[in-house]
């Protein structure tokens, strides 16, 4: 476990999971910088316990992203295009994500946590004519690039997200969990726990709602 406060850069800081993550990290004495595209969201993320940083990661090159990342101890990618045109999905969920990995490496920030989705990978099985295909394909490429990097990465892959109250209980694919659903609050808790566990570098955490406390379930996951 990490025994000291970290400086965590959360990309996609106004997303639903990120907004639940920031207060968890702040409560654990970590300093959170929330990257947001819309300056009107600054008050929200400040209320979450994070320091807002306005930047459009979709438009930034690796050099600019390196400046953004530098000075932090960890990066959390929780950004996404949120549907819409496939071209933008690829621009954000694949291209910008990959540039952020390159930036983290250039900035000397080794710890990198990617929020992906349960089932991502070459065998995602989404047909090309499905509206979800662009996202599945973009995530497959981005996740593979992260796994091939020399960063201390962890892939967090929740199943279908809900706004139900968090329970603090999950089940991972390690114990046979199939795709189901999980509250966003529990996803945020998993990310917070993963950040504090260097031993989960190189691990893929696929999970949904279950019966085992998050901390206990993650104890059994190895990188």
Show the residue positions of the predicted features.
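Core catalytic loop region at the nicotinamide-binding pocket of NAD(P)H-dependent oxidoreductases
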Residues: 194-218
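Glycine/proline-rich active-site loop of Rossmann-fold NAD(P)-dependent oxidoreductases
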Residues: 124, 165-170, 194-203
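Flexible, glycine-rich beta-alpha linker
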Residues: 122, 154-175, 207
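Substrate-positioning beta->alpha
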Residues: 97, 138, 156, 178-193, ...
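NAD(P)H-binding glycine-rich loop region in Rossmannoid oxidoreductase-like domains
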Residues: 34-99, 103-106, 195-199
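Conserved Rossmann-fold NAD(P)-dependent oxidoreductase catalytic core, especially the SDR/UDP-sugar
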Residues: 31-35, 39, 81-91, 95-148, ...
